[in-house]
């Protein structure tokens, strides 16, 4: 039997992401983050020496909470990095002075031209997010500044530029603010100066992303949900003759909340593509030859794929596996599986998988008869003793386009190893189950998701998922809205609710959130001012007086997505109605908690709260 997962191990874990082979395949670099600090590190591919931090002078942008697209190689001896202040800088891979390439706005998703003479990147300002190109010119008179970047895109949002191998073209992913990228978006191919721009994929009702030219330059691959599922498509370099690499009812991408997603990679010879296949929350690394035929190499989620050197480098994780930078050899090992080595692990020393649990897929009928999916974690022992049903924690993901995926989720394992069962629902609106499942939430956020989770609550006893008399609900961000509405409308089935940086006021969110989500609610709630009453009715703050179960509200004071005032308004309304509520604000934390001391407090505070109101009540 395993031991409870210590909060200290969770709090001391590092984030790892965006691994890339250096040209030539002798080195690998990736991003490591601890707390609010992130850096790019470089290591020999054979692991002969420890990774070396190359951004100590300037830091690197975060890869979590909407962060991503942090860096790229520029030749084999430099890196273009988005530093901690959002500038684009040039960093020598072996150490040396840092050069500023652009300090206009905030940079992201850099991509070097094949000759290293220019960097394409996204340049975000208050009113625009464009693909821009900046030349990498020699220093003049000791200046550390380069030339001004030139905008080449013209949509509301443009991300993830990619160069053709001969430097003659750029491709990128763009969309307009009347939609989110997973609603509808476009792949554009243009000259490096933006000339001859042509939309080659996507458009009305179709979501696309991750454009990537083949190493030889004869083909362009990207993800598209034109079949109803995010599959990898391949066209010629001009975007003509597109067809899916395979047509599967599995997703091969996640919603693009941030730039830099790499869920597939070309082989060095362009003859095959490696892809992470989402199998209803579980996942596999699969290689498919362009001539036909697929081979599963490894189980588990693989993010940030890059194929070079002696294999496929990625960040691998699973329910019992903390994220690690791994290299999988696609040509060796047992049939169906590739050999794998670990270059870096996010978990600190002392991490053990003993006692951690693999979830089981579950489903139940929604109140309207539709099928709702989820994952159920069964603990090795019940927190209430042998022979008893375990208390159940229902944890609702954010988004609401998130997914209860079989990835490393320490929140779930923390409670499972303490004798709680965990149900992680995927109410409709979640991704991972096809486009129709996601788009079923159109106009119904705050209603259908609540109904789907309520139907799950009704199944707890009959399905034996846990003790129906000892149920707690937790949720973060969009999932916090669903959790709080469940507490208001179905509180008779719940003992306590925990909200982490939750949306509580939809009208307020529409007025104050950041630009990326400024029109998000148009599709999943309704258009303003026409549907203002719907916004009010779907807001937890409107129903605060009906929340009669104990409530814990956790919030960061630096949250740019959900302003802290939303938590304050909810807490004040619950207290005014005579409800029981605890409220804690974490200094310096944004939309998602990162600091070691915050994480330690969050787990301790939540565990004490649930013990008081669920286990000991």
Where are these regions (language model features)?
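Beta-strand-rich domains and repeat architectures in extracellular enzymes and scaffolds
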Residues: 4-41, 69-70
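A short beta-strand motif characteristic of beta-propeller blades
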Residues: 5-10, 52-54, 58-61, 97-102, ...
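Non-catalytic accessory segments flanking enzyme active sites
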Residues: 17-20, 38-39, 108, 122-123, ...
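Blade-terminus and WD-like Trp-Asp/Gly-His loop motifs, strongest in beta-propeller folds
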Residues: 19-27, 71-77, 110-118, 161-169, ...
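A flexible loop/linker signature enriched in serine peptidases of the S9 family
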Residues: 31-41, 59-65, 80-89, 102-107, ...
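Blade-loop segments of beta-propeller domains
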Residues: 50-76
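Cap/lid segment of the alpha/beta-hydrolase catalytic domain
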Residues: 346, 350-469, 476, 509-515
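Active-site-proximal cap/loop segments of hydrolase catalytic domains
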Residues: 427-617
